[in-house]
């Protein structure tokens, strides 16, 4: 194994150029290099794998034990099936184990490094070096053209190759290098890019919603949240900015402006059965609901929506209304915090123009798109990294 990365010059013979040395790009480079292909990894950043480094609170949620196509958003929801089946979470776990990286399952199948996400970056670099991958970083790409071969002009020289792989990611977190470069290359070669928006991102709320949550910061509510046919059961956290937590991040990828979130505050019970069973009680409505909701939250919710009187004084009609509202409490966001803080970008290169088996552009032989730049977006919990590994592997078998 090489201890020093192989650096490429503009005179180096190259078969495959991969632009973007993140999770997908390095995985593709490893697999292509193993096949004896002469691979060059280009990246505009001097420090590689920054998104890996910051992920999972610095411990990298590198995959999930339960990966299915249903865990991904795309205009073509079946596109990811082939790649995910050919390189699975267990395949990546095997690679992690080979390098002696200790890991644990946190919750819901989410796997994290015991120590540091840097271990994953170092592992990928070692695998690249062992496969003979050459590096050219930092390198800024000025232009990409295709004649008989692809020609890539950079501030480090010009490179020619038979196969060009775009693994430049999305728009999320520009502070660590995200740019629209990959989308521009797709459009230059005639591919369509779908609408782009931030995903796994914090939502913002108007003054009316913020007034409701005033003084409730820190309260966590077990709830199911739904929007546009998507449903997630995770903790809902009240903050000074409104609602946050895993449930909000998950649903944000599905939310569109002007649409309400539906919150089920009683996901484990039949709310109507519960309130009718409590009818003989002298307790105030808020105190009854505090049997399964945090007391302060229950009080505020009742004060905002109903009259806080003894439940025995409430009519059957209104009890049914209370029960219905508990299962379908409507909250409308007014925006998101944007790409600068989003974990992913929803949308990307239209998958109808790519081969699901190889990631190659159907109308541009030798041009491949992998990872987040493609219109495949995973849920929170390691799914986006698995897509990076799987799509990178798929392209790496053929470039």
Feature-to-residue mapping (PLM):
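Beta1/beta-strand and adjacent pyrophosphate-binding region of the FAD-binding site
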Residues: 10-24
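Core beta-strand elements of the Rossmann-like FAD/NAD(P) dinucleotide-binding domain
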Residues: 12-14, 154-163, 231-233
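Glycine-rich FAD pyrophosphate-binding loop
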Residues: 17, 33-57
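Short hydrophobic core segments
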Residues: 17-19, 42, 141, 159-175, ...
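An anion/pyrophosphate-binding glycine-rich loop and adjacent beta-alpha core
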Residues: 45-48, 53-54, 62-69, 102, ...
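Glycine-rich active-site loop/strand segments that organize a redox cofactor
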Residues: 57-105
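A glycine-rich dinucleotide-binding beta-alpha-beta segment and adjacent secondary-structure elements
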Residues: 137, 300-377
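A conserved short coil-to-beta-strand element within the FAD-binding core of flavoproteins
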Residues: 137-149
């Amino acid at each position: 194994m090489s201890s020093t990365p192989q650096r490429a010059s503009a005179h180096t013979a190259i078969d495959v150029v991969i632009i973007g040395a993140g999770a997908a790009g390095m995985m593709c480079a490893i697999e292509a290099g193993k096949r004896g292909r002469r691979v060059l990894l280009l990246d505009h950043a001097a420090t590689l794998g920054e998104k890996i480094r910051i992920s999972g609170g610095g411990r990298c949620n590198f995959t999930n034990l339960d990966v299915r196509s249903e865990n991904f958003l795309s205009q073509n929801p079946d596109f990811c099936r082939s790649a995910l089946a050919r390189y699975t979470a267990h395949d990546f776990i095997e690679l992690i184990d080979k390098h002696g990286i200790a890991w644990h399952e946190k919750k819901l199948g989410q796997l994290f490094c015991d120590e540091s996400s840097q271990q994953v970056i170092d592992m990928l670099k070692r695998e690249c070096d062992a496969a003979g991958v050459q590096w050219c970083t930092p390198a800024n790409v000025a232009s990409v053209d295709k004649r008989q071969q692809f020609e890539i002009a950079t501030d480090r020289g010009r490179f020619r190759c038979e196969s060009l792989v775009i693994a430049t990611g999305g728009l999320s977190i520009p502070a660590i290098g995200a740019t629209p470069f990959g989308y521009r290359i797709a459009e230059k070669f005639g591919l369509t890019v779908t609408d782009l928006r931030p995903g796994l991102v914090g939502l913002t709320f108007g003054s009316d919603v913020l007034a409701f949550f005033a003084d409730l910061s820190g309260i966590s509510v077990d709830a199911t949240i739904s929007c546009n046919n998507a449903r997630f059961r995770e903790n809902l956290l009240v903050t000074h900015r409104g609602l946050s937590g895993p449930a909000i991040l998950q649903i944000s990828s599905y939310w569109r402006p002007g649409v309400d979130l539906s919150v089920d505050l009683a996901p484990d019970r039949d709310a109507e059965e519960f309130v009718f069973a409590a009818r003989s009680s002298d307790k105030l409505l808020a105190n009854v609901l505090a049997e399964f909701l945090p007391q302060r939250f229950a009080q505020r919710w009742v004060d905002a929506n109903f009259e806080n009187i003894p439940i025995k004084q409430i009519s059957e009609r209104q009890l049914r209304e209370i029960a219905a509202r508990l299962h379908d409490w409507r909250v409308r966001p007014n925006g998101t915090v944007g790409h600068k803080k989003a974990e992913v970008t929803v949308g990307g290169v239209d998958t109808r123009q790519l081969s699901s088996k190889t990631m190659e552009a159907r109308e541009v032989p030798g041009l491949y798109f992998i990872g987040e730049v493609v219109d495949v977006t995973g849920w929170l919990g390691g799914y986006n990294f698995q897509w990076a590994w799987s799509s990178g592997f798929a392209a790496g078998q053929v470039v």
